[in-house]
Curated annotation (Swiss-Prot):
Example of a GO biological process term: protein refolding
Gene expressing this chain: groEL
Organism: Mycolicibacterium chitae (Mycobacterium chitae)
Protein name, per record: Chaperonin GroEL
A GO cellular component entry from the record: cytoplasm
Protein purpose: Together with its co-chaperonin GroES, plays an essential role in assisting protein folding. The GroEL-GroES system forms a nano-cage that allows encapsulation of the non-native substrate proteins and provides a physical environment optimized to promote and accelerate protein folding.
Length: 120
């Protein structure tokens, strides 16, 4: 029963990561699997599940604070192109995203749809 709960949790983590960030689902899935595996191992060894939960929550808070402290604003078209290029794994796509963002502005919306038409 715990394994099924763990699998559902990992699935939910991947879905939520995709919904919120649109990227990082693999990293989130690997982290969630490790948390479930190690959590179950610790509970089986006699650890208090609520204590584990509190420890995980504190760790998440600390990591989140540190990530926010080290985060850098992406402001220029060149920075946007570089960041998007890294995320897409393709500098040409990064340049296209930067160009689109330049046209719609910081509060604009860019919709990307898959096409079955070659070259479009």
């Amino acid at each position: 029963p715990y394994e099924k709960i763990g699998a559902e949790l990992v699935k939910e983590v991947a879905k939520k990561t995709d919904d919120v960030a649109g990227d990082g689902t693999t990293t989130a899935t690997v982290l969630a699997q490790a948390l479930v595996r190690e959590g179950l191992r610790n509970v089986a060894a006699g650890a208090n599940p609520l204590g584990l939960k509190r420890g995980i929550e504190k760790a998440v808070e600390t990591v989140s604070e540190n990530l926010l402290k080290s985060a850098k604003e992406v402001e220029t078209k060149e920075q946007i192109a570089a960041t998007a290029g890294i995320s897409a794994g393709d500098t040409t796509i990064g340049d296209l995203i930067a160009e689109a963002m330049d046209k719609v502005g910081n509060e604009g919306v860019i919709t990307v749809e898959e096409s079955n038409t070659f070259g479009l």
